[in-house]
């Protein structure tokens, strides 16, 4: 029988992202190891589906282009390192507001690297920005929610699971396209 840490190391060889599945919260460190993080908050996530079509540019090609040509890529990498330290503190402190602010800021900075690449491109669409605005609007009304995005147009909503039902109800009134609840 292998320990979770040993299984993580084996999984890492097959897929960089698969090893995160062994922990509720995990961080990939610079030395290649994966660290389990602790937080007393119970997070939920839903996806506001903007577009289900295949991306025009793959994540791998996009990242290579950003690394090679984006004038803001190095600044984003430094920001990500700083955000990593801040995020670990916020998780330890169970500070959902800080977690959400870091999440949004870093996602926007990452997407900003695409517009300074040559040739420039964007995964985000007008509807992506509309989805982000919905999250901001609900937050201004007292809902505890923040957005994030990976390399694509869809917007993920981070929230506390205890708020899921009322948040889903409110988002459904504003977002008329598909919503996916990500269950644990």
Predicted regions and their residues:
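Gly/Ser-rich oxyanion-binding loop with an adjacent helix/lid
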Residues: 1-42
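C-terminal nucleotide
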Residues: 38-184
């Amino acid at each position: 029988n292998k320990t979770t840490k040993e299984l993580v190391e084996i999984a890492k060889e097959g897929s960089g992202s698969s090893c995160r599945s062994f922990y509720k919260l995990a961080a990939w460190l610079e030395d290649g190891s994966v660290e389990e993080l602790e937080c007393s908050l119970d997070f939920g996530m839903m996806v506001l589906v903007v577009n289900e079509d295949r991306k025009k540019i793959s994540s791998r090609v996009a990242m290579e282009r950003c690394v090679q040509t984006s004038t803001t890529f190095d600044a984003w990498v430094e920001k990500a390192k700083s955000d990593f330290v801040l995020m670990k503190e916020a998780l330890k402190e169970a500070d959902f507001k800080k977690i959400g602010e870091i999440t949004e800021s870093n996602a926007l900075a990452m997407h900003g690297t695409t517009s300074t690449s040559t040739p420039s491109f964007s995964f985000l669409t007008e509807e992506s920005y509309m989805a982000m605005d919905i999250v901001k609007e609900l937050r201004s009304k007292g809902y505890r929610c923040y957005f994030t995005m990976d390399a694509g147009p869809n917007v993920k909503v981070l929230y506390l699971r205890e708020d899921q039902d009322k948040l889903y109800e409110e988002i459904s009134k504003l977002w008329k396209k598909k919503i996916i609840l990500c269950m644990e």
